Amino acid sequence: MKRMGMVIGIKPERIEEYKTTHAAVWPEVLAKISDCTIFLREPENLLFGYFEYHGQDWAADSAKMAADPKTQEWWAIHNPMQTPLASRNEGDWWAMAEEVFHTD
């Protein structure tokens, strides 16, 4: 298992809509993820996502998820609500964060 953190901006005028849609995530989207949490930081309007990856090949698994039509539909709704960080890696939407501490 690998812990993953990621950050993205959210447009302030879209925060309530983002919360509403995430209160009822589609089953087809939920079937592709587990152990996932998204936090909102205001007034900076940042989303911090945390999830646990349980696979062996992150690149292949994330490409498979990205190819899923329902996931693409979900992203098409939510991407306009978000503001990617300029410092993100090329090709990424969310900026991945480095884990610097963990304890059980």
Which stretches of residues belong to each language-model region?
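Hydrophobic pocket/interface hotspot
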Residues: M6, Y18, H22, G49
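Eukaryote-biased recognition of C-terminal alpha-helical segments
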Residues: D92-F101
